Amino acid sequence: MKKRKLLVTTALPYANGSIHLGHMLEGVQTDIWVRYQKLAGNECYFFCADDTHGTPVMLAAKKENISPEQLVSKIHTEHYNDLTAFHIEYDNYYSTNSPENRFFSEEIYNSLKKNSHISEREIEQSYCDHDKMFLPDRFIKGICPKCGAKDQYGDGCEVCGSNYSPKDLIDSQCAICGNTPGLKKSKHLFFKLQDFQSELSSWIENPNHVHEGVRNKLNEWFSQGLQEWDISRDGPYFGFEIPGEVNKFFSWRTVFFFIAL
């Protein structure tokens, strides 16, 4: 029988808090499967890492009065010790805040920009005059504009699953000081997802590429037409700086997308 080459990972735990039961369950189940593959003689590598960038880490670090770098270092040690205490054996347990990740994020971005798949334009965003900063993602909370659920973040509703712009929140408040934000313009960078819609749409039709349920969901998005994706965040922000830009950072979702590539 031909030996298989396998690269295995689990969902990356976020670096703003402790491991929970769901992380541990997934880790143990995956470890059992990986051990079997190795015993069967397959070339199998088990990787995972802490998800470190973004506003939740910044907020958690601010509460502890330490830097984001100090927080992710402390949490990484805690996560690794907890997971390995359950005899979960990773070939590598790392961090998204790594020099390798920075290198490949910059390389992919520069390639996309060189081939005209990056655009830029000025957008209007929520801005806190008290804290002197823009309020992306979890720096702003309010009422969901889709379902009316209270206390929702600016990057999406945890009740109805809708995505929206932070400035669309109803009765929004800065997550740091609680004040009502205003609006301010800033230049942002966008990845032209629509440039790849035809190629992606054709690729998923192959039954060997994706599960039918995944294909159906993707076709829902394709039927609406892929839109440009905002890949930038204004400083202060904990993440990788965008090459050639001043005080602009890759959003944490962008870095994850580049990792997947």
Set out the residue ranges of the language-model regions.
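Residue-level detector of anion-binding/catalytic polar loops
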Residues: 43, 89, 118
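Cys/His-rich short segments
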Residues: 116-190
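A charged helix-plus-loop insertion that forms the helical arch/lid used to bind
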Residues: 60-73
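A glycine-rich helix N-cap at a beta->alpha junction
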Residues: 77-91
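Structured secondary-structure scaffolds
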Residues: 1-48, 95, 100-104, 147, ...
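Short, charge-patterned binding micro-sites
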Residues: 50-56
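A non-catalytic, amphipathic alpha-helix used as a structural packing/dimerization or gating element
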Residues: 32, 70-81, 107
